[in-house]
Amino acid sequence: MSIMSYNGGAVMAMKGKNCVAIAADRRFGIQAQMVTTDFQKIFPMGDRLYIGLAGLATDVQTVAQRLKFRLNLYELKEGRQIKPYTLMSMVANLLYEKRFGPYYTEPVIAGLDPKTFKPFICSLDLIGCPMVTDDFVVSGTCAEQMYGMCESLWEPNMDPDHLFETISQAMLNAVDRDAVSGMGVIVHIIEKDKITTRTLKARMD
């Protein structure tokens, strides 16, 4: 069994027209044993910037804390909000530093540029190799199912409501086909003037 699937979990981000969405499941378990259904996997890293972490639960929390520390230092030194691309470099550095004994988590970043409001999504592997795309990124135990749903449902230039419907359907249907993720989904829709957070009910088995 892979250490990446020990706790299970699924994270996904999608790009729309002047907006992005990031979603994650709510389950925290130890293999087949379920522990809690309100585990946080998406963390705010700025006003319009979020990171989702799928993988080993201890490393999810460790990486989130260490990243927040580095982010606070950056904002104190620079006196401005971090750009999504810069956050990606920061995460890549954090992961690559520990490449010989890595953090077992594969991050997904979604957000808008603080000045231009240009949408940005990317994913990284567990040693910090980034992949920036213009459609969607996925991470977690049901990555294959999420890719299948996203490739079927995603369209370019979706408005926020259409984007929410698409990412919700993709996420709910993907986690239904994975035994170690699910138990509800949380979705953040990031727009220029607001962030909408919705919690979706899913199968509880």
From Swiss-Prot:
User: Where on the chain is N6-acetyllysine found, per UniProt?
Assistant: K77
Per the entry, what induces it?
Up-regulated in asthenozoospermic sperm.
Give the InterPro entries listed for this entry.
Ntn_hydrolases_N, Proteasome_beta_3, Proteasome_bsu_CS, Proteasome_sua/b, Proteasome_suB-type
Per the UniProt entry, what is one GO biological process?
proteasome-mediated ubiquitin-dependent protein catabolic process
Query: What cellular component terms from Gene Ontology apply here?
Result: cytoplasm; cytosol; extracellular exosome; nucleoplasm; nucleus; proteasome complex; proteasome core complex; proteasome core complex, beta-subunit complex
CDD domains noted in UniProt:
proteasome_beta_type_3
Please indicate which superkingdom the organism of origin belongs to: Eukaryota
- Entry-linked Gene3D superfamilies: Glutamine Phosphoribosylpyrophosphate, subunit 1, domain 1 (3.60.20.10)
Which SUPFAM superfamilies does the record associate with it?
N-terminal nucleophile aminohydrolases (Ntn hydrolases) (SSF56235)
Q: Give UniProt keywords alphabetically.
A: Acetylation, Cytoplasm, Host-virus interaction, Nucleus, Proteasome
User: N-acetylserine occurs at which residues?
Assistant: S2
Cell compartments where the protein resides: Cytoplasm; Nucleus
Q: Where the protein is mainly located, per its record?
A: cytoplasm
- Protein function: Non-catalytic component of the 20S core proteasome complex involved in the proteolytic degradation of most intracellular proteins. This complex plays numerous essential roles within the cell by associating with different regulatory particles. Associated with two 19S regulatory particles, forms the 26S proteasome and thus participates in the ATP-dependent degradation of ubiquitinated proteins.
| PANTHER family from the UniProt entry | METALLOPROTEASE TLDD, PROTEASOME SUBUNIT BETA TYPE-3
Describe, as the record does, how this protein assembles with itself and its partners.
The 26S proteasome consists of a 20S proteasome core and two 19S regulatory subunits. The 20S proteasome core is a barrel-shaped complex made of 28 subunits that are arranged in four stacked rings. The two outer rings are each formed by seven alpha subunits, and the two inner rings are formed by seven beta subunits. The proteolytic activity is exerted by three beta-subunits PSMB5, PSMB6 and PSMB7.
Q: Which family does it belong to?
A: Belongs to the peptidase T1B family.
Its recorded name reads Proteasome subunit beta type-3
What is the scientific name of the source organism? Homo sapiens
